[in-house]
């Protein structure tokens, strides 16, 4: 029976804001002292294998309904109980969940990053520290364009069309408003070394109270 529970750090912000960079900066600074797990909300998009490819491409991936939040909460709670989980893998080329899973062991620090990780109360309630990464719209778009064309096999035109049709409106409607739930707001994303250092100091402080 474990006498303590992992601490959960939620990192939210728009696509391309620097969430992943910050998560890995924290990992690099703390990994020598603690076992750390990074989880991404992108892994928990709903399984769309019942839809045609044409219909999958029409899905609004920046809307809260695109995510399998019950599964995310369930697996996060299992990890908090120090139980391993089979984490889903999302295939961004096929626009659906892969048949593969990743066997994931629990850790003392769990960093959960994603556009809407602060959007649901039952998920926020599991977090010890809530972070919102606030980055200029133009910078976020350029980063998303580079990522989706280089890593996800997208065309420039499709990325631009998606940004104008869903990404920007969904950011304004659903993502940016979750900033009010954050304990810490990090401007300029992964480029803000001072904020990242302050964040790791805060995490160490929280850790010292549960060890």
From Swiss-Prot:
The yes or no answer to whether the keyword Transcription regulation is present is: no
- Would the keyword Transferase turn up in this protein's UniProt record? yes
Report the catalytic activity. Answer: uridine + ATP = UMP + ADP + H(+); cytidine + ATP = CMP + ADP + H(+)
Biological process annotations from GO: CTP salvage; UMP salvage
Q: Which UniProt keywords apply?
A: ATP-binding, Cytoplasm, Kinase, Nucleotide-binding, Transferase
> Which Pfam families does the UniProt record give?
PRK
Q: What EC number(s) are associated with this protein in UniProt?
A: 2.7.1.48
Q: Which residues bind ATP?
A: 13-20
Top-rank EC class of the record's enzyme: transferase
List the SMART domains: AAA
- Give me the Gene Ontology terms describing cellular component: cytoplasm
**InterPro entries, alphabetized:** AAA+_ATPase (IPR003593), P-loop_NTPase (IPR027417), PRK/URK (IPR006083), Uridine_kinase (IPR026008), Uridine_kinase-like (IPR000764)
Lineage, top-rank taxon, reads Bacteria
- A GO molecular function for this record? ATP hydrolysis activity
Q: What is its main location?
A: cytoplasm
* Pathway(s) this gene product operates in, as recorded in its UniProt entry: Pyrimidine metabolism; CTP biosynthesis via salvage pathway; CTP from cytidine: step 1/3; Pyrimidine metabolism; UMP biosynthesis via salvage pathway; UMP from uridine: step 1/1
The subcellular location is: Cytoplasm
Family, according to the entry, reads as follows: Belongs to the uridine kinase family.
Q: Which HAMAP family match?
A: Uridine_kinase
Q: Which NCBIfam families match?
A: PRK05480.1, udk
Q: What is this protein called?
A: Uridine kinase
């Amino acid at each position: 029976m474990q006498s303590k529970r992992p601490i959960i750090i939620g990192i939210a912000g728009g696509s391309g804001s620097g969430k992943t960079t910050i998560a890995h900066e924290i990992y690099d600074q703390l990994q020598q002292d603690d076992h750390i797990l990074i989880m991404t909300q992108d892994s928990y998009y709903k399984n769309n294998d019942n839809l045609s490819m044409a219909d999958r491409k029409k899905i609004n991936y920046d809307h809260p309904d695109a995510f399998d939040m019950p599964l995310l909460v369930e697996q996060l709670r299992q990890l908090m109980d120090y139980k391993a989980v089979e984490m889903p893998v999302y295939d961004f080329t096929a626009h659906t969940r892969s048949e593969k899973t990743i066997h994931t062991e629990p850790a003392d620090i769990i960093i959960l990053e994603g556009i809407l990780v602060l959007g649901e109360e039952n998920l926020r309630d599991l977090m010890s520290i809530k972070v919102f990464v606030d980055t200029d719209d133009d910078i976020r778009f350029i980063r998303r364009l580079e990522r989706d064309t280089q890593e996800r096999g997208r065309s420039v035109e499709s990325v631009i069309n998606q940004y104008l049709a869903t990404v920007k409106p969904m950011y304004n409607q659903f993502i940016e408003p979750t900033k009010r739930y954050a304990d810490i707001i990090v401007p300029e994303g992964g480029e803000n070394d001072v904020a990242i250092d302050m964040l790791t100091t805060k995490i160490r402080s929280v850790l010292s109270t549960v060890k």
